[in-house]
């Protein structure tokens, strides 16, 4: 098997982009919000980045970053009314937002409507051209196209690692503790002095920015985007990454995206039965492990075995409950 086959290398690229998208929805889940707007923000980042690089002739990097910022701006506008909603109402509102965005892109001339945008500058192709310029075609027995794909994978991995590092940093900060408190009980968190709306908006905007970046990368990897790429199917797919891998830890999104990106390719030989088996495996796993494959306690045990942590794991919900009970006792003592 030729591991440098462009098809296999493209699967690796899609896995990394899927991991980024899974992390984008992880932030809203971490703050107790079931948002289904990730595909909408992804489409904003994809179209803005593609149009800027294709029609405004801006560098790919600049277009992708601006796409992420525009997605964040849209999140501010959408988030002000929707983050006050809870549960199913928030899910329906954000799902509706995604459909509205898709229909808008479907009817705009600048997006080429239903025909989609083609000829988008490709990151692998640009790096392949760079490989030719550096005269490394054939170096170590690897041709320029493979070098271009490998360099694209390295760049995507660096972006993914930076996003994961940012998530870990956030989780271990005051912001992460506020997210956990809101997820455990937003009413109790508010009584403890946490600005619930502010932190929910923050999670919403961060998630939108990451989704916008993921969309920009997707557009410049596939070289073509169409409004149907961001339909309801994409919404479900993105949600499955953290839910399947473990929605309580950032590594769950990475693991879930790896398995769910690879699984259809592994089952390809089953032809017509592939989707049935794929769906059955998802149902079985959700029944056996409703919290996903990875849990907080499991990640904590692995971290302590590797020497990254020394203190034993204590569930965040337990800590928050104890703090809230202590807070109530103090209030009762003051009133007494």
Language model features by range: what are they?
Residues 1-336:
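Transmembrane alpha-helices and adjacent helix-loop boundaries
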């Amino acid at each position: 098997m030729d591991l440098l086959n462009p098809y296999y290398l493209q699967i690796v690229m899609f896995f990394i982009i899927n991991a980024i998208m899974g992390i984008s929805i992880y932030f809203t889940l971490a703050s107790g919000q079931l948002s289904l707007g990730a595909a909408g923000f992804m489409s904003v980042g994809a179209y803005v980045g593609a149009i800027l690089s294709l029609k405004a002739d801006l560098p790919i990097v600049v277009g992708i970053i601006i796409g992420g910022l525009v997605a964040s701006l849209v999140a501010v506008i959408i988030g002000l009314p929707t983050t006050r909603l809870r549960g199913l109402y928030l899910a329906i509102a954000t799902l509706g937002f995604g459909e509205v965005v898709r229909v808008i892109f479907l009817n705009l001339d600048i997006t080429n409507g239903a025909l989609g945008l083609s000829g988008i500058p490709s990151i692998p192709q640009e790096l392949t051209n760079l490989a030719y310029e550096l005269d490394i075609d054939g170096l170590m027995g690897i041709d320029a196209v493979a070098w271009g794909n490998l360099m694209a994978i390295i760049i995507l991995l660096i972006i993914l690692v930076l996003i994961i590092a940012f998530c870990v940093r956030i989780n271990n900060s005051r912001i992460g503790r506020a997210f956990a408190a809101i997820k455990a009980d937003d009413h109790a968190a508010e009584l403890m002095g946490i600005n619930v709306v502010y932190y929910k908006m923050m999670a919403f905007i961060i998630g939108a920015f990451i989704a916008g970046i993921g969309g920009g990368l997707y557009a410049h990897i596939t070289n073509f985007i169409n409004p149907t790429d961001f339909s309801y199917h994409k919404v479900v797919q993105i949600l499955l990454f953290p839910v399947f891998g473990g929605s309580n830890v950032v590594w769950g999104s990475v693991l879930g995206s790896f398995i769910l990106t690879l699984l259809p390719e592994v089952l390809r030989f089953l032809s017509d039965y592939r989707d049935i088996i794929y769906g059955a495996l998802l149902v079985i796993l959700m029944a056996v492990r409703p919290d996903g494959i990875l849990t907080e306690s499991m990640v904590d045990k692995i971290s302590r075995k590797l020497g990254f942590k020394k203190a034993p794991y204590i569930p965040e919900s337990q800590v928050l409950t104890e703090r809230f009970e202590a807070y109530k006792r103090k209030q009762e003592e003051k009133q007494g």
